């Protein structure tokens, strides 16, 4: 699979590095629990996020003031992290979150 958009490629590369460093949580349940615990500093949301994930994670993040960053497709995120499609990823490290914001469409947060 190719990702022609250089911003998406950079975001995926940073997510992969963060995941290997255990600074990225994946999946609705893990991200939701970390949001409730207050340990997530931003959430990357797949472009094709399901209504269920949007309801459970995106609204919770927005309600807690956690920035939401638009990502590529769930399939592209999953392929980079060696997992099936990943709709949401929670970032635990502030420096990584900053890098992801820079990579993600000029750093503009998405609407809930």
Identify what each model region corresponds to.
Residues 1-5, 13, 19, 98, ...:
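Catalytic cores of RNA-modifying enzymes
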Residues 4-45:
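N-terminal first-folded block
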Residues 11, 27, 31, 39, ...:
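Amphipathic alpha-helical interface surfaces
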Residues 36-58, 65-67:
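N-terminal positively charged helical leader segments and presequences
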Residues 47, 72, 93:
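Short secondary-structure boundary segments
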Residues 57-85:
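Mid-chain, well-packed structural core segment of small domains
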Residues 75-112:
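C-terminal structural segments of small proteins and small subunits
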């Amino acid at each position: 699979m190719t990702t022609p958009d250089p911003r998406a490629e950079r975001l995926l590369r940073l997510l992969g590095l963060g995941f290997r460093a255990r600074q990225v949580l994946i999946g609705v349940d893990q991200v939701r629990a970390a949001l409730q615990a207050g340990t997530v500093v931003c959430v990357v949301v797949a472009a094709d996020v399901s209504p269920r994930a949007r309801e459970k994670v995106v609204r919770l993040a927005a309600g807690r003031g956690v920035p939401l960053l638009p990502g590529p497709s769930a399939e592209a995120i999953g392929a980079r992290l060696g997992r099936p499609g990943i709709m949401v990823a929670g970032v635990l490290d502030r420096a990584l979150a900053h890098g992801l914001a820079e990579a993600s469409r000029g750093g503009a947060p998405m609407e809930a």
